[in-house]
Amino acid sequence: MKDVNEEERIIGAESSEEDETIELSLRPQLLAQYIGQDKVKSEMKIYIKAAKQRDEALDHVLLYGPPGLGKTTLAFVIANEMGVHLKSTSGPAIEKAGDLVALLSELNPGDVLFIDEIHRLAKPVEEVLYSAMEDFYIDIVVGEGQTTHAVHVPLPPFTLIGATTRAGQLSAPLRDRFGIIEHMQYYSVEDLEKIIQRSSVVFNTKIDPEAAIELARRSRGTPRVANRLLKRVRDFAEVKGEEAISLVTTKHSLHLLEVDDEGLDQTDRKLLRMMIENYGGGPVGIKTIAANVGEDTDTIEEVYEPYLLQKGFITRTPRGRSVTQKAYLQLGYPPKDEK
């Protein structure tokens, strides 16, 4: 079944180099410009204002939720609102403790260190963070053999912003050192429509309101997907010579791209069909699903499942995953209890 990887999926929420370029051009600078995530924004606004009034570094922030929801963008906005510099890296990029020490030593008072995929930090690297986050110091081991000794290095107060799609994989000692923990939710159709309209201005194109709504409905609650689909639909509209992207062109384009009215693509439908046709709709164990899809279990849980769960196409049970009646109807199967 494995014929389309996450980076190739038009509705895949994982970031590509093209996505990063697009998102950089679309990135808001202030919380007031950041569309959606109202609860997170209102709380962060208070925390930022309080920290600035006390002339202190903002407390450490953990942002978690599915990919493509704007965690990196929000980190940059937070740093900008605080009036400080942000240094960006990722968990896999920090291979050893020395790499983290080098990053920390470059920070000025109040600066933000942003670590994406923080759940993928190596254990020795994570342990260096403990004292850095809690007491703003690190111990560096220098010398060899009998001359080995630890050097106590103070750090300026800084803010660590960690982003993760797998909050459950963070160790308790690391998670407990974050004073602010925010859950990023899937976006509403209304917020996605606003994002699409805003992005169309940046892309120097026009889109009819009803077309923007249709695009928002199929964007899986994810701004990254919405912007990617907007670019592709824009291509179809320009080839047709439309001055503004129409609803007809939007529907036709998404049909050709195999994105249905619920935002499911060919890969989603194959996964659901496999569960229905091979296992009677479930329950199916996660390892069995992974073997059929040709992915590891982490990819299933992180990439495929979140949207299917959120939209009610599958459920989790103690014995595995089951397909819902909604999925049967969406794929044109008779309801399960009628079979």
Curated annotation (Swiss-Prot):
The keyword Translocase does not apply. Residues 2-187 are annotated as: Large ATPase domain (RuvB-L). Its EC number is 3.6.4.-. It is found in: Cytoplasm. One of its GO terms (biological process) is DNA repair. Residues 261-339 are annotated as: Head domain (RuvB-H). ATP binds at residues 26-27, 68, 71-73, 134-136, 177, 187, 224. Has 3 domains, the large (RuvB-L) and small ATPase (RuvB-S) domains and the C-terminal head (RuvB-H) domain. The head domain binds DNA, while the ATPase domains jointly bind ATP, ADP or are empty depending on the state of the subunit in the translocation cycle. During a single DNA translocation step the structure of each domain remains the same, but their relative positions change. NCBIfam families: PRK00080.1, ruvB. This is Holliday junction branch migration complex subunit RuvB. The gene is ruvB.
